[in-house]
């Protein structure tokens, strides 16, 4: 089993963890529905960048 040769200092430990921070999600407002959503995703009504790309089918 691998064992560290020397103890990592608090500074080195914290530098190692610098990329572990929780970053806030980027939320945008849909241009057609006005709802909040994640970027680069299809809106609830099936539109993407203001154009209809997905049309819901009626349930039978």
From Swiss-Prot:
InterPro entries named in the record: Ribosomal_bL32, Ribosomal_bL32_bact, Ribosomal_zn-bd
Region (Disordered): 1-23
GO terms under cellular component: large ribosomal subunit
Molecular function terms from GO: structural constituent of ribosome
Keywords carried by this UniProt record: Ribonucleoprotein, Ribosomal protein
GO biological process: translation
Pfam families associated with the record: Ribosomal_L32p
Domain of life (superkingdom): Bacteria
NCBIfam families: rpmF_bact
Family: Belongs to the bacterial ribosomal protein bL32 family.
Record's protein name: Large ribosomal subunit protein bL32
